[in-house]
Amino acid sequence: MFFTTSPDALFIPPATIDPVGFGKVAIVTGCGSGVGLACAQLLLAHQYSVCGLDAREFNYALLQEADHGRFHFHRADLTGPRACEDGVYAAVASFGGRIDLLVNVAGVMGSFSSADGVTDSEWDRVVAVNLTVPVKMMRAVIPFMLEKKSGVIVNVASTAGVSGAVAGIAYTCSKHGLIGATKNVAWRFRKEGIRCNAVLPGAIDSRIGKAIAAGHGGDEEFDAEAYAQVEPVHALHAQASESTPDITPLEVAQSVVFLATDQARTINGVSLPIDQAWNVV
């Protein structure tokens, strides 16, 4: 397997890659960079038709030209009214009336604020993007999956979804909630042929990962006092990982693709850590 050299690099698949997605349709949120981009690239390589959703414009140069015909980009702020439904309808209009796979990747970090310092705007924004949007996306795709008694949902959560010592309160709560939503959907629709799992990446080479390393949350400055309380945990993980390569977005995407295949037919409702043993600390 050829690994991308950066979060926004072009993925060139080997000639022998398994076309497990032939004839299937996938939706990927947050497709413009990092894990979302890697998922879109890898799913296309596996012959899925992919509808990518992102708030930023998409750079088609990051896809192989041969894959452009199986990729539809829909630009949207998914926190807007009916934006999730419109995104799903864009996929259905582009590729027919089926949705085989939903990958909820889109997320924001926030500023690491603790409970005594989090602002209403930070809380509302982080929870909206990281939890409300994935739930609304699941709500929108499940009727299409129920029609054919088949479908897979993979939610990209985080090690922060099982720990209180990794991120700020808004991000931590949003990812805990997403894991809970994953389990609820898995149990509720287990008899209808729908599987729902979560992957829990640790520190990865992505836009959010680079923001943490630089000491800011992308669009928001970190709460330095609150971040100081979780920084030792990040430092411990970084120290333990010095002898191994960074986790790449492609490696997370490979786990997503595995969970989407029939090889994972009996795997439902799991939270799969992808973190080089960070979750055991």
Where are the regions that the model predicts?
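Short, small/polar-rich loop/turn modules that mediate ligand/substrate recognition or access, typified
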Residues: 190, 195, 267-269
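C-terminal substrate-recognition "lid" of short-chain dehydrogenase/reductases
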Residues: 138, 243-274, 279
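Alpha-helical segment proximal to the catalytic Tyr-Lys
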Residues: 143, 187-188, 265
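Residue(s) in the substrate-gating loop at a strand-loop-helix junction
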Residues: 158
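Conserved glycine-rich cofactor-binding loop
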Residues: 32-33
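Substrate-binding pocket helix/loop in short-chain dehydrogenase/reductase
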Residues: 113-115, 119-127, 230
